[in-house]
Amino acid sequence: GERDRLLFGIEFVPIGYWQQYGNDTYNGTMFAHLADLFFRLSGHLHDCKLIKIDTTHFANQGEDVVSQLVKTLQITSTYFDEMEKRNVPLEELVQLCTFRFGIGSNFFFEIAKLRAFKILWHNLIKAYLPEMDFITNPEIHCVTATASFTQTDEHSNLLRTTTAAMSAILGGCDVLIVTPFSNSGENNAIQLATNIQNILRYESY
């Protein structure tokens, strides 16, 4: 029979693509497509995410946490402004956003980054929707960054990824991806990345 509820994530991310790859075709067409997609799926977007604000490339380029937060808010504001122009209700749109952060090995700064972002998110929503009484926390996905990785002693990257993973968890992320410590064909790199997650989840208190 017909399904009344769809569970999926589209994660529309044009701004992140333009910023990461230097594409010069930035225009309003993609936002028009996004607005059209919203209206077509409106009523079926329960527990789904339509927009992904992906700032992992900033972390992988070595930018500091303040710069990452500023750019995240700038990107989010751009989406809000463009969708508001196209009559998309922001009180519904804010529930459809997910955020993806790269997490470095600066332990306390990365914890603070995620916690600060939750406060900034609430302030941003209040600025756009001052009458909104209840604001949910943003959904945050984290990926351990590779900016501090070394190729001369690759196994030391295990310490960096573990530290970054702990920061993400203590900062309050919802989803965590641990990047393998090596891209040089190390057979157990993916397994060790999985083990880091399992140890932090099941054996750490």
What residues fall within each predicted segment?
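Non-transmembrane, aqueous-exposed alpha-helical and coiled segments at domain scale
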Residues: K126-L129
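Catalytic alpha/beta active-site cores
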Residues: G1-N106, E131, N137-H141, I169, ...
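Short, well-ordered amphipathic alpha-helical segments that serve as non-catalytic structural scaffolds
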Residues: Y79-E82, L120-L124
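Short, acidic/polar
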Residues: L158-A165
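Glycine-rich beta-alpha junction loops
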Residues: H57, W121, S182
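Conserved, mostly hydrophobic/aromatic
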Residues: W121, G171, I196
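Active-site or pore-adjacent capping/gating segments
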Residues: T163, D174-Y205
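Short glycine/threonine-rich loop-to-helix capping motif typified by GTGT followed
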Residues: E63-L69, G104-A116, A145-L158, G185-A193
